[in-house]
């Protein structure tokens, strides 16, 4: 990782905060160790760095490196989503859908998923399509499923398509089967 002596100085300087927000959780933990990583991420998030808000929110949601705090995670995702981060918009939708740190609000979840999908987040597109399909808007759902699958890395694409093979709507199952047949890895994978 190189010489990271600068990390042990005040986190208020913007370039330091940006450098920290660009690190993965594992890199932060390695560079700073445990609580220091969380402190630096909190400082970066408080300075308004969207990536730090997103990263801190994920850590708080999962309890990775910090005690799980879904209310605080929700607040981080709300801030990052307000900064235009598509992944945070999707995660905010998950919070609304599942009641993580906030009251369950299906309409707010749908709006967050739509924003994430429109911003290019493949998970947001998938989640928005699931909401549309549940509401009976199959044509719209299929368009968003297609966009989500097209934008996903191969492992996520395969996971999404395999899950959709069990969807209650026949048209969605057919879409998933066609998608799996066109994936070179899926068509040669005998264990699936």
Residue ranges and their predicted role:
Residues 13-15, 29, 33, 46-49, ...:
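Short helix-capping/linker turns of helical repeat alpha-solenoids
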């Amino acid at each position: 990782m190189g010489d990271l002596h600068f990390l042990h100085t005040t986190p208020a300087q913007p370039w330091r905060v940006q450098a920290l927000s660009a690190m993965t959780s594992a890199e932060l933990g390695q560079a700073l160790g445990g609580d220091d990583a969380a402190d630096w991420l909190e400082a970066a998030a408080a300075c308004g760095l969207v990536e730090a808000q997103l990263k801190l929110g994920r850590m708080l949601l999962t309890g990775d490196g910090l005690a799980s705090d879904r209310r605080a995670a929700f607040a981080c995702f709300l801030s990052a989503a307000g900064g235009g981060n598509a992944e945070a918009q999707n995660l905010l939708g998950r919070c609304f859908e599942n009641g993580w740190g906030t009251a369950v609000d299906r309409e707010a979840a749908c709006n967050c998923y739509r924003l994430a999908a429109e911003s290019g987040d493949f998970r947001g597109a998938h989640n928005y399509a699931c909401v549309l399909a549940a509401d009976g808007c199959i044509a719209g759902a299929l368009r968003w499923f297609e966009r989500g699958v097209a934008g996903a890395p191969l492992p996520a694409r395969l996971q999404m398509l395999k899950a959709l093979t069990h969807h209650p709507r026949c048209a969605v199952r057919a879409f998933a089967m066609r998608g799996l047949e066109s994936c070179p890895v899926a068509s040669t994978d005998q264990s699936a």
